[in-house]
A protein has these predicted regions:
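Conserved ABC transporter NBD signature motif
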Residues: 72-80, 92
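Conserved catalytic motifs of ABC-family nucleotide-binding domains
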Residues: 98, 103-115
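ABC-type ATPase nucleotide-binding domains, specifically the catalytic core motifs of the NBD
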Residues: 17-25, 68, 80-87, 111, ...
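Helix-to-loop junction immediately C-terminal to a conserved catalytic motif
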Residues: 64
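The feature captures the beta-strand-to-loop junction immediately N-terminal to the Walker
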Residues: 49-51
Length: 134
């Protein structure tokens, strides 16, 4: 049985402009991602590993729409992630998750772990009784 492609990343690139620290110093272009391509199939989970500074977080941020790519395309269920209608965008936001390598950047230290889990369950429309059992 052939599985459906749910996300496709084609020739993705992301550049950042680094401004000079001194007056008159030229800006530099930092190539964080260059020509990244892959497909994620239905039922798969993607894990990205690599050395510090290799672009893992930048790629993740592009996939969850926190950074706009400089080039290439990201499609989710056959639709361009950056140009999809609001309804589809909300569904994609529920389905695509990112776990940051630093827990302080992904969890709110003012909230309990159970509150954070419950909040995610509400987003995914898991009922109150099921939520309480878990």
């Amino acid at each position: 049985m052939q599985k459906n492609v749910i996300m496709s990343v084609d020739h993705l690139s992301k550049d950042f402009v680094i401004r000079g620290k001194k007056i008159g110093e030229k800006s530099k272009l930092l190539h964080a991602l260059s020509d990244v391509s892959f497909d994620i199939y239905e039922g798969e989970t993607l894990g990205i590993i690599g050395e510090s500074g290799c672009g893992k977080s930048t790629l993740g941020r592009c996939l969850v729409k926190l950074h706009k790519p400089s080039g290439g395309t990201i499609t989710y269920n056959g639709k361009d992630l950056w140009n999809m209608p609001v309804y589809d965008r909300e569904a994609a936001r529920r389905d695509i998750q990112m776990i940051f390598q630093d827990p302080y950047s992904s969890l709110d230290p003012r909230k309990t772990a159970s509150y954070s889990i419950e909040e995610a369950m509400k987003v995914h429309h898991i009922g109150d009784t099921a939520r309480e059992r878990r």
